[in-house]
């Protein structure tokens, strides 16, 4: 049982409804965005590879930018959306997600899906790190050398949907754990 499951059980003793992502929101597959499209400034962009190597559970700033002309043809990411990777060289990394909490629309490209929803974005991004999600994505993944979980397949993933106030309380607790863990790691490395 994950920490999220424990918190849901504690905060919602009557249980919660599980719903497919495709019912909770809309999953929009990105298209094309090689790193050669990056510019010094312009429209914020998150490349799927950066979700593995640079971003944590959420972010308010992008590391990369593309021209407005390039951005016009890419998948739009609005504040509160979650970007989920579709492709990886291993099962562990496919489906890694980052919640976009910035104040402007940004873009993403291929090998990523934008999840547009009305839930707490950080709750979704945290839930996409759970063993429950891992078990479901394992069944939906295809490929051997390159693993893929399509946007269509992600629509079938079922997740718990507690009330928004419970989602926010779970996020508050998990954020606190994340902060404490980072502080402890910093002290151990010092």
What are these regions (language model features)?
Residues 1-11, 82:
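Accessory (non-catalytic) regions of SAM-dependent nucleic-acid methyltransferases
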Residues 7-31, 190:
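Non-catalytic DNA-recognition/assembly elements of restriction-modification systems
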Residues 10, 32-33, 70-71, 101, ...:
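Short, solvent-exposed loop/turn positions at domain surfaces
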Residues 15-17, 155-189:
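Amphipathic alpha-helical segments
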Residues 22-35, 49-81:
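Sequence-specific dsDNA recognition surfaces
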Residues 47, 69-131:
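A short beta-sheet element
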Residues 104-106, 187-190:
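Short amphipathic alpha-helical linker/capping segments at the junctions of internal repeats
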Residues 105-111, 142-162:
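A short glycine-rich beta-alpha junction/loop motif
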């Amino acid at each position: 049982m994950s920490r999220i499951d424990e918190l849901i059980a504690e905060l919602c003793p009557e249980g919660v409804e599980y719903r497919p992502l495709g019912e909770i929101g809309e999953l929009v597959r990105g298209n094309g965005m090689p790193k050669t499209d990056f510019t010094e400034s312009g429209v914020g962009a998150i490349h799927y590879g950066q979700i593995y190597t640079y971003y944590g559970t959420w972010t308010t700033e992008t590391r990369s930018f593309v021209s407005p002309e390039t951005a016009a043809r890419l998948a739009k990411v609005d504040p509160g959306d979650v970007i989920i990777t579709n492709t990886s060289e291993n099962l562990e990394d496919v489906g890694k997600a980052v919640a976009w909490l910035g104040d402007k629309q940004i873009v993403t490209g291929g090998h990523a899906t934008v999840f547009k929803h009305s839930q707490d974005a950080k709750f979704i991004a945290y839930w996409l790190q759970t063993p429950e999600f891992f078990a479901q994505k394992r069944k939906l993944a295809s490929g051997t050398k390159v693993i893929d979980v399509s946007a269509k397949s992600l629509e079938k993933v079922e997740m718990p949907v507690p009330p928004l106030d419970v989602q926010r309380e779970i996020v508050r607790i998990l954020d606190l754990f994340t902060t404490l863990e980072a502080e402890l790691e910093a002290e151990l490395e010092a």
